[in-house]
């Protein structure tokens, strides 16, 4: 046997003329000597559907050869370890980084290396298969590969990889990464199976319709069960597992030594203790001589894979009828069918599953080939959603001129109540064909990082056109124009300056002063600083920020340090929008809110160590909410004072009352309503009698009743901002208001005073009126306000022996409510109120899932084994528990489950406390 290490890896087929395969030895040699030796024995080299023999193609920009992928998983599943192997085999690094040693490329923050976890997502670009030594390639194009019936993995692809956190406290990091991905690799721990955070992130990825493959990792560990994990993929991830590889255990029950590839019907055997670059490859005949039991299982797996694909792809049915044998269906036909199912309408139903052990350097290169072969490029991914004016559509339709603006004559965001029938007014259609010619580039800022050397770095995904160095970028969210002085390609913590970032790629812009996470950045033709209407309203689908549930006070060491602390907080919030900063009006304390205890601890470390703020963080507290218990009297306030040296006068009337989000579609009042939306758990309604809104030819709202300094949008926004400001602090307990309905009435005749009325004065009047209505309610005899607490959706994973103790603890001592055992329902992961495409759930019969037998199980297979096959089977508890009772719960759970229990939680809703519980909480807060 001859093998030869390449930059990536080498898979060498055993030479048939040798009588004993086990006499093969690993020998280092050059690629040329490898070709000569194999060629002399075989006459013609047999091809393998992996990338070991790839001569690489042009390294230039090619969207078909670009992959924007993410690594998603539960904490400690092996995401960063797998990423480090990918970088090593691609030639990006010369050694393999280790999480325990703190030597990884993608975990570069001091806190990440100290804790051994990923805290912030890291972007890195590499090529697979690796480029030639001079950085160029000369391999075939995808068209040539197609004509030769060869896989895509024979041509070098540019892989933009994002390694995401696994800890639940850093969910926002995962969300903003998912927003810009075209595909993802979901890594599962072969011992733990499908864990709670994995399930949560999987369903979040489904919201964005991201094609995914599953990689079952850690199969070298004791207790690893690939077959059981495959069945859990079907039952918990709501899809049919397409088993593309099965593990190779020495002697059937021994150590993990390699994998058997179901697509190519080959066995891959790695050298024990090696770096994973040298692999022996056995065809089916050779595998029968080496491990007959594995060869038989491989045949079963191939039959199951072809049968599964035949149920979802007619081309596979035709291929099977043509060859009349599951084993004779060509590997390329299977690859094409898998890709078709993964990218087409069946994308949520078929889940390709691969196997390996990244720490032992086994299975990573075939996984990289699967990324090239199965996952989509930017041009094949879902057309991004956009809003333009008050209309919604897709960016592709806008660029092709097929998007037509439908401008309602009044407002587009209002849930209209049932009214008497009126004469219908047709919406105004605005042609957008001319807009595509004006749009040079469109990008989404998905992350902002403060770098000590380079300043503020804004990570962007370019969706159309090319973002060029020095171009003028218009921020459609903030309505400001900034120049992009420098562009970079990021390699974890290192950066390489580039002249442009093309469509479909991820890059970094430095020098932007205002851009935030979720902002849309566009550049247009011409010399004007502001794009023409309605192009200046173009916005890509934003990144939704989950609500914070913990907070802590931040105090500077001295008054002289307060300015530096505030500047550091501003940088921290620009980096991480899931953090919130508020100031308590009574005490003057600055409060920092976040997603969890660890989230706030990391924020404190960054504030003190990275931004050098001289400040101290107080005790971490729970973020409660305040709700109204009755309806207030109408309160009218007239704001009349100077603002910034100019006279300002405006008035407004406000009424507050309880709002029940579960009561169905709420009524929004009469026909004078110009705004009615749910914002941060509250409903804000704005009524403007006498405003008389009309729509011009461009679809813009206008009103002749408003003073000249107002347009309809600024009038509406001023009132909205005033109400929002008042709702940030309750009248009795100073918590933010929740489940509160505010109705603002601004009569343009009575409450506006010509040129004296300004936007700031109107906003102040709305704030004063809303605050007055809240105080009126708080001082009333039969009403007032109450406290609401966050209730968490908790998913607990424990073994069978600990089930009873944990259930009793949750339902009694912690006041929780058990929803289900063994997760009968998928985790709710609504993002921004959008329903997942998985609302039409795939019905999975676990008994029909093919799964290979695990070590020490009876060989079997197409019928599979029941999920409850083991006495030590992990059980899953789903419960609703008040957040207060979950603080510090992990330590208690581990004591109940002998250290084996884990849990993940996210905010389900806010619930009003009982009087007794509210009294206890207030007493604790006033200590």
Curated annotation (Swiss-Prot):
Binding sites annotated in the UniProt record for GTP: 73-80, 163-167, 217-220
Family: Belongs to the TRAFAC class translation factor GTPase superfamily. Classic translation factor GTPase family. EF-G/EF-2 subfamily.
Lineage of producing organism: Eukaryota, Fungi, Dikarya, Ascomycota, Pezizomycotina
Organism, scientific name: Talaromyces marneffei (strain ATCC 18224 / CBS 334.59 / QM 7333) (Penicillium marneffei)
Transit peptide extent on chain: 1-57
Gene3D superfamilies (UniProt xref): 3.30.230.10, 3.30.70.240, Elongation Factor G (Translational Gtpase), domain 3 (3.30.70.870), P-loop containing nucleotide triphosphate hydrolases (3.40.50.300), Translation factors (2.40.30.10)
A GO molecular-function annotation: GTPase activity
Cellular localization per UniProt: Mitochondrion
UniProt KW Transit peptide keyword: yes
SMART domains the record matches: EFG_C (SM00838)
Name of the featured protein: Ribosome-releasing factor 2, mitochondrial
């Amino acid at each position: 046997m001859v093998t030869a290490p390449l930059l990536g890896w080498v898979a060498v087929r055993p030479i048939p003329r040798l009588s004993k395969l086990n006499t093969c030895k690993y020998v280092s040699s050059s690629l040329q000597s490898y070709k000569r030796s194999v060629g002399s024995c075989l006459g013609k080299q047999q091809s393998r559907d992996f990338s070991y023999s790839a001569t690489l193609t042009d390294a230039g920009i090619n969207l078909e050869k670009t992959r924007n992928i993410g690594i998603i998983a539960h904490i400690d599943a092996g995401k960063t370890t797998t990423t480090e192997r990918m970088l090593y085999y691609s030639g990006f690094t010369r050694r393999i980084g280790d999480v325990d040693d703190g030597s990884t490329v993608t975990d570069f923050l001091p806190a990440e290396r100290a804790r051994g976890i990923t805290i912030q997502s890291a972007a890195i670009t590499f090529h697979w298969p690796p480029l030639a030594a001079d950085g160029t390639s000369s391999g075939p194009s995808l068209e040539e590969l197609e004509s030769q019936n060869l896989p895509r993995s024979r041509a070098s692809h540019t892989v933009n990889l994002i390694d995401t956190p696994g800890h639940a406290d850093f969910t926002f990091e995962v969300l903003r990464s998912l927003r810009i991905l075209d595909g993802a690799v979901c890594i599962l721990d072969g011992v733990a199976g499908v864990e709670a955070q994995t399930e949560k992130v999987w369903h979040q990825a489904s919201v964005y319709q991201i094609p995914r493959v599953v990689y079952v990792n850690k199969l070298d560990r004791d207790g690893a069960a690939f077959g059981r994990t495959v069945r859990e993929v079907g039952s918990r991830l709501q899809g049919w597992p397409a088993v593309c590889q099965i593990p190779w255990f020495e002697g059937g029950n021994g150590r993990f030594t390699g994998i058997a590839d179901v697509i190519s019907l080959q066995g891959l055997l790695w050298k024990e203790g090696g770096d994973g670059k040298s692999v022996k490859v056995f065809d089916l005949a050779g595998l029968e001589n080496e491990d007959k039991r594995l060869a038989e299982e491989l045949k079963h797996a191939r039959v199951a894979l072809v049968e599964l694909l035949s149920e979802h792809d007619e081309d596979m049915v035709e291929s099977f009828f043509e060859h009349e044998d599951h084993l004779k269906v060509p590997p390329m036909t299977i690859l094409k069918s898998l890709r078709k199912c993964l990218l087409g309408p069946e994308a949520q139903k078929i889940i390709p599953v691969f196997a390996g052990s990244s720490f032992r350097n086994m299975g990573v290169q075939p996984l990289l080939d699967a990324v090239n072969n199965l996952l989509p490029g930017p041009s094949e991914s879902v057309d991004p959603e956009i809003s333009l004016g008050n209309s919604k559509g897709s960016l592709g339709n806008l660029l092709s001129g097929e998007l037509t603006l439908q401008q309602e004559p009044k407002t587009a965001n209002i849930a209209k109540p049932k009214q008497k029938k009126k004469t219908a007014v047709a919406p105004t259609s605005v042609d957008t064909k001319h807009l595509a010619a004006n749009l040079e580039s469109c990008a989404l800022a998905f992350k902002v990082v403060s770098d000590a050397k380079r300043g503020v770095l804004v990570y962007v995904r370019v969706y159309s056109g090319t973002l060029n160095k020095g171009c003028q970028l218009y921020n459609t969210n903030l309505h400001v124009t900034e120049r992009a002085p420098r562009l970079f390609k990021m390699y974890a913590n290192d950066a390489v300056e580039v002249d442009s970032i093309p469509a479909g790629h991820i890059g970094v812009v430095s020098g932007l002063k205002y851009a935030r996470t979720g902002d849309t950045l566009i550049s247009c033709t011409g010399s004007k600083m502001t794009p023409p209407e309605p192009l200046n309203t173009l916005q890509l689908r934003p990144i939704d920020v989950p609500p914070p549930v913990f907070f802590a006070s931040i105090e500077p060491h001295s008054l002289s340090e307060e300015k530096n602390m505030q500047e550091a907080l501003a940088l921290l919030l620009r980096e991480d929008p899931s953090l919130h900063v508020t100031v308590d009006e009574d005490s003057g304390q600055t409060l920092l809110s976040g997603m969890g205890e660890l989230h706030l601890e990391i924020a404190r470390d960054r504030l003190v160590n990275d931004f050098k703020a001289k400040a101290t963080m107080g005790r971490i507290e729970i973020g409660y909410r305040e709700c109204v218990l009755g309806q207030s009297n109408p309160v009218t306030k007239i704001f009349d004072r100077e603002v910034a040296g100019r006279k300002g006068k405006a008035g407004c009337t406000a009424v507050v009352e309880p709002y029940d989000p579960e009561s169905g579609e709420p009524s929004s009042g009469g026909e004078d309503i110009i705004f009615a939306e749910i914002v941060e758990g509250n409903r804000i309604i704005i009524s403007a009698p006498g405003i008389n809104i009309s729509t011009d030819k461009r679809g813009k709202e206008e009103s002749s009743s408003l003073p000249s300094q107002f347009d309809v949008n600024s009038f509406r926004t001023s009132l909205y901002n005033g109400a929002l400001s008042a709702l940030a602090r309750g009248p009795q307990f100073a918590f933010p208001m929740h489940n509160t309905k505010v109705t603002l009435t601004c009569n343009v005749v009575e409450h506006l005073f010509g040129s004296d009325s300004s936007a700031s004065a109107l906003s102040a009047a709305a704030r004063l009126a809303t605050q007055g209505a809240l105080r009126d309610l708080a001082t009333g005899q039969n009403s007032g306000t109450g406290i609401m607490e966050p209730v968490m959706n908790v998913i607990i994973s424990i073994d069978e022996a600990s089930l009873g103790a944990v259930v009793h603890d949750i339902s009694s001592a912690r006041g929780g409510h058990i929803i289900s055992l063994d997760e009968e329902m998928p985790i709710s992961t609504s993002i921004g109120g959008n329903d997942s495409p998985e609302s039409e759930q795939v019905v999975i019969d676990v008994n029909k899932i093919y799964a290979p037998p695990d070590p020490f199980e009876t060989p079997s297979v197409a019928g599979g084994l029941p999920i409850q096959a083991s006495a030590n089977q992990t059980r899953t508890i789903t419960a609703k528990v008040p957040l207060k009772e979950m603080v510090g719960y992990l330590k208690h759970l581990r004591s109940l489950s002998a250290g084996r229990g884990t849990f993940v939680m996210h905010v389900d809703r806010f619930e009003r406390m009982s009087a007794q519980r509210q009294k206890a909480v207030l007493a604790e807060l006033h200590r």
